[in-house]
Amino acid sequence: MRMAFERTVTTDKSFDEAVTAIEKKAAEKGFRVLYVHDVAATLAEKGFPRDPLKIVEICNAKYASQVLAKDAKISLMLPCPISVYITGGRTHISTMLPTAITAFFPEAGIEEVAAQVEKTVLEIIEETR
């Protein structure tokens, strides 16, 4: 059985409206936007044009500190990425489920923190759509 590791929603917002809404909603929920990667622009610069795609990196220092105290290698999966992209003319918002991290670090005991972060991240994308 395949483990669910992501959630994707479709929105009627334009691409730019969705990116801006994610940034605003993340701040409202206590997360800081660390960086927005314009993947489409980067690929286009290298000769690989594609439909719009940005990755919004968000982080909550309290939660990050808690999981990193358990295992520094969890940093490989931080910060929380939220992707906004266009496929088939529709704007989509996707995120990796933070609880999926627990499968990679079962001894870390981060299930409770991961569940709290996941609840908030899912609220961010649902309230943004």
What is each residue range found by the language model?
Residues 1-33, 126:
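Terminal, regulation- and interaction-focused segments at domain boundaries
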Residues 13-15, 62-64, 88-90, 99:
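Residues that cap or initiate secondary-structure elements
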Residues 19, 66, 103-105:
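Short acidic, gly/pro-rich beta-turn/loop elements at beta-sheet edges
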Residues 20-21, 38, 70, 120:
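Short Gly/charged-rich anion-binding patches and loops
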Residues 34, 38-83:
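Compact, glycine-rich, soluble single-domain proteins
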Residues 81-106:
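Beta-strand/loop substructures that line and gate deep hydrophobic ligand-binding cavities in soluble
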Residues 104-129:
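Well-ordered alpha/beta subsegment
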